């Protein structure tokens, strides 16, 4: 009967090799999918950044006109909706990545892939918080400038209000009461009345928008704060690596320079030795000749 052990061993090795290939391929596919998701998030963040710039432009147009066109305000509202929708989508994806990393960490998987995912997640979270902070600052600035326009219109009508009084009127959230109070105090022009009413409505919308962003900010900003040191360490290591490479280049240049000088000195010493030997040989020759 023929011994089948070598064949079985070969088959087992072949199976093990196939399994290793399958695991490697699955791993590669997983990281490919992850990096694809990273690029999608980066693109979404870049899209929000562009929308924020458009929002700022619309803010400037609205503030520069006493009664801006409805089209501009509609465009601004659409931009705000798109930013919030995209931001919530990004937030969901970042949460999913965070949970995936936590699961792998709890399973004692501390592979290079996990560290890469953690780093990418931290970098993306920071970029996301940065762009949303810029958006929030634009909203707050628009609110303050709109409030300033209302104050100026009130001053034109002869009514002076403090910041506290204006804030109290704005926080009431009832434009009709707000305007009726103004009318009862002074005879106001229709144009000034329309602008005050328009600015008041803008501020009411902003209040809602800023409140909606608050939860997202608290959630993402806290994560970035806890993970920030890791990102800073990575950035520090990269900078140190670059400095080390530059230092190594300088040291290499110095070594080559010193080596060149040393080689030149060797040739000079050799030439001097040869000259001395030649002189000694000449002296000895002359002495013997006598």
UniProtKB/Swiss-Prot annotation:
Q: Which residues lie on this side of the membrane: Cytoplasmic?
A: 1-266
Q: Which GO molecular function annotation, any one, does this entry have?
A: calcium-dependent protein binding
Report keywords, A-Z.
Coiled coil, Membrane, Phosphoprotein, Transmembrane, Transmembrane helix
Quaternary assembly: Interacts with SYT6 and SYT8; the interaction is Ca(2+)-dependent.
**Where is the major localization of this protein?**
membrane
Which residues, by range, are in coiled-coil regions?
Answer: 69-106
Q: State which tissues express it.
A: Heart, spleen, liver, and testis.
Protein name per the record: Syntaxin-2
Q: Its family?
A: Belongs to the syntaxin family.
List the source organism. Answer: Rattus norvegicus (Rat)
Tell me which residues bear Phosphoserine. 14
* Function comment: Essential for epithelial morphogenesis. May mediate Ca(2+)-regulation of exocytosis acrosomal reaction in sperm.
A Pfam family that this protein carries is: SNARE
Q: How does it sit in the membrane?
A: Single-pass type IV membrane protein
**Annotated ranges, domain t-SNARE coiled-coil homology:** 193-255
Q: Which GO terms describe its cellular component?
A: basolateral plasma membrane; cell surface; cell-cell junction; cytoplasmic vesicle; endomembrane system; extracellular space; lamellipodium; membrane raft
Biological process (GO) annotations held by this record are: acrosome reaction; cell differentiation; cellular response to oxidative stress; cornified envelope assembly; digestive tract morphogenesis; epithelial cell differentiation; exocytosis; intracellular protein transport
Is Ribosomal protein a UniProt keyword of this protein? no
List membrane-spanning regions.
Answer: 267-290
Where in or outside the cell it occurs: the entry states: Membrane
Please give the InterPro entries that the UniProt record associates with this protein: SNARE, STX2_SNARE, Syntaxin, Syntaxin/epimorphin_CS, Syntaxin_N, T_SNARE_dom
Matching PANTHER family: SYNTAXIN (PTHR19957), SYNTAXIN-2 (PTHR19957:SF36)
């Amino acid at each position: 009967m023929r011994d089948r052990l070598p064949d079985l061993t070969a088959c087992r090795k072949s199976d093990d090799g196939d399994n290793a290939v399958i695991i490697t391929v699955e791993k590669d596919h997983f990281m490919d999918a992850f990096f694809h998701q990273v690029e999608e998030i980066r693109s979404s963040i870049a899209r929000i950044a562009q929308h924020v710039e458009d929002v700022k432009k619309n803010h400037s147009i609205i503030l520069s006109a006493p009664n801006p066109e409805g089209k501009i305000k509609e465009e601004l509202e659409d931009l705000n909706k798109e930013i919030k929708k995209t931001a919530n989508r990004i937030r969901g994806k970042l949460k999913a990545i965070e949970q995936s990393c936590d699961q792998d960490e709890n399973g004692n998987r501390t592979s290079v892939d996990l560290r890469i995912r953690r780093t990418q997640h931290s970098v993306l979270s920071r970029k996301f918080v940065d762009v949303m902070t810029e958006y929030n600052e634009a909203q707050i600035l628009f609110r303050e400038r709109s409030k300033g326009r209302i104050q100026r219109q009130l001053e034109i009508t002869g009514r002076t209000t403090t910041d506290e009084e204006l804030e109290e009127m704005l926080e009431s959230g009832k434009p009709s009461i707000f305007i009726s109070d103004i009318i009862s105090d002074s005879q106001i022009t229709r144009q000034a009345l329309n602008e005050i009413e328009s600015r008041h409505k803008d501020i009411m919308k902003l209040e809602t928008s800023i409140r909606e962003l608050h939860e997202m900010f608290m959630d993402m900003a806290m994560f970035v704060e806890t993970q920030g040191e890791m990102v800073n360490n990575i950035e520090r290591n990269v900078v140190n690596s670059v400095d080390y490479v530059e230092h190594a280049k300088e040291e290499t240049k110095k070594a080559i320079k010193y080596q060149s000088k040393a080689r030149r000195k060797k040739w000079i010493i050799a030439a001097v030795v040869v000259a001395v030997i030649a002189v000694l040989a000449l002296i000895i020759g002359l002495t013997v000749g006598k």
